[in-house]
Amino acid sequence: IQSTSMDQGSLSEDSMNSFIRTLIQAGIWKNKVPKQTARTKDGMQTTVKEAEAEPGAVANKGVRLGSQPVVSVDTELLRQQRRFSSPRVLLSENAPLEPPPLYLMEEPMVLNQTSRRKRFAEGKSHRGEYSVCDSESRWVTDKSSAVDIRGHQVTVLGEIRMGSS
């Protein structure tokens, strides 16, 4: 999954939930995890057997640690869901060439030199403002689980196959 900005409007949470429901109904997350090939830490391919998944259980149950499930997504399904395009997420078969910009102003299309800019005084003081955490801009490629915006544990997909391959 590649993060990028697109010129389409922002998504509401309901439309994204609807898209996820459509993916689920299309058979991506059924009660069984199909046979998959997964790469182990030493680079060898192994075949993962079918495993029964309990409702609400993590989809990679039965998969060795360090490997992630591979989910096949029909390209036609994604074409039908164009209205669910997110300004922050783009599904792509290619790895990103560079990390996403931290701020919208770093986008080349947004940088318009003729636009008016607000002037700031030199030596601007920041009284009472303290950094809560360090900002880090980098691609994370080794995560297998994460916490969503509602605080629920979710599985991060390592690969999404598109098309009939």
Swiss-Prot record:
Species name: Morelia spilota (Carpet python)
Taxonomic lineage: Eukaryota, Metazoa, Chordata, Craniata, Vertebrata
Subcellular location: Secreted
Any one Pfam family match given in the protein's UniProt record, by short name: NTF3_N
Alphabetical UniProt keywords: Cleavage on pair of basic residues, Glycoprotein, Growth factor, Secreted, Signal
Domain of life: Eukaryota
Residue ranges listed under propeptide: 4-119
Primary location class: secreted
One cellular component term from this protein's GO annotations in UniProt: dendrite
Record's protein name: Neurotrophin-3
SUPFAM superfamilies: Cystine-knot cytokines
SMART domains assigned: NGF
Role description: Seems to promote the survival of visceral and proprioceptive sensory neurons.
GO molecular function, one term: growth factor activity
Annotated InterPro entries: Cystine-knot_cytokine, Nerve_growth_factor-like, Nerve_growth_factor-rel, NTF3_N
Signal peptide: 1-3
One GO-annotated biological process of the protein: cell surface receptor protein tyrosine kinase signaling pathway
Protein family per UniProt: Belongs to the NGF-beta family.
